[in-house]
Amino acid sequence: MKAQSISRRTLLKGASALAVTGALSSLSCAQTGGSSAGAGALPARGEFIIRGATILSMDAAVGDFARGDVHVRDGAIVAVAKEVAAPSAIVIDAVGMICMPGFIDTHWHLWTSMLRPMLSTDDVNRGYFQVTNALGRFFTPRDHYASVRLGLAEALSAGATTVHNWAHNIATSDHADAELRAMRDMGLRGRFSYGPVQGAPNDQPMDLAGLAKIKQQWMPNDDMLTLGIASRNVGDSTNLLRGNISVDMAHKDWGGARALGLPITMHTSGQSPIMLLEKAGLLGPDVQLVHPLLTTAAERDILKARGVSYSTSPVGESQRPASAGVIQLAELLESGVKASMSIDLTGTYNVDFFQCMRFLYSLHRHRVGARVPLTAKRLVQLATLDGAVDLGIAQRTGSLTPGKRADMILVRTGDINMAPMADPYEALVNLAQPRNVDTVIADGRVLQRAGRFTALDHAEVLREAIEAGNALRARAG
């Protein structure tokens, strides 16, 4: 069944039992908070000390502490030590918790978050690509805002402090503006990668005028948000639903982005395009590729030489058939290619960075074994500091380093699935779950405390997403 032939009845099958009232009621019990986060509604930055935590700094110069303190003032990390004296600071008791950098996602299609009720893993006609391709062109700016907020709310609850919003369904600059407003209003750090709307003609360049308009309106800002482009595939690809452009068109799109000083990201599903991109002179340190599944040793040498980074989405990639390739984390690490970790989507699975690390560890041991060492600490680095390196923001975040911005989380170690704890890195990779995330701090703002949002109205976020989804299905017919 072609994507375009999906009917409203097909999409609504199984989704009509959404039970709006019940969903709102049960989820509100799990997360409660104050008024909806919006411009000016975020918690204030201040001065506080994380006291008595097990500190994993991800900075060799700072080191780790079995028990230590982190001093934060006006959104910046002031000190990390065994003991910090700051009489005027508010104390956050973190005894029995791990304090670590927040997770950094490097590739996530947030606009698809509200499509969960319409997706199915058992019905091919309601698969992710079929549904998103069929409905993408019907999205309004309001839909984008609601869907991005829904995805970011789950990201926040799971311990993310930075998300790369891979927005490959931008019809107009108004649609882009809506997604950026959602990102700003949620208070997380992130990159917004502007990509053509679903079904955009392959023989036409992306909307570079709209991209320039968004850059003028949003950049520079307070360094919480950066901008890039999400490119259509270049050359042959198994995923024809996401666009396949020629090298000449890639030069137009990528050249337009580079003229604006913006980085580029692109999927590499199917036949590897790396040699084609290299021959065309398109690769560089401003390029991020996604899904490292079918690269060769020669291609990886090129990527290292050009400074290209690669994002792996372990949960989604592990669901692909063997013919699509395998996650090549070991090969990337062995070749010295920059790598990072990402969620990809939440339509058919949940946000769980701990699970992502476990998947990578298990697949690595199964396929590679001890030939290429991979420790729990290295995986935590992949999920934090390496993501900052990939997104070009390591000077601001990714580690608990004095002078960097205070993007950090507290993970409870006394919960039944975590205790008793020995090695904190192994506990994070092998045992932890999103429900163990106690506190989330982004740019010095405490966005979650004791497992509850501090300013976000969870019920309102969910209600808006449900209403937008219902209206979308009605418009699609």
Residue positions per predicted region:
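His/Asp/Glu-enriched, well-ordered alpha-helical/loop segment
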Residues: 330-415, 431-433
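Metal-coordinating catalytic core of metallo-dependent amide/deamination hydrolases
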Residues: 40, 174-300
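Alpha-helical scaffold segments that flank or form the walls of functional sites
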Residues: 116-188, 212-221, 466-468, 474
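Active-site gating loops and adjacent loop-to-helix segments of metal-dependent hydrolytic enzymes
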Residues: 114-144, 237-240, 271-286, 302-310, ...
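Divalent metal-coordination and catalytic microenvironments
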Residues: 53, 70, 75, 96, ...
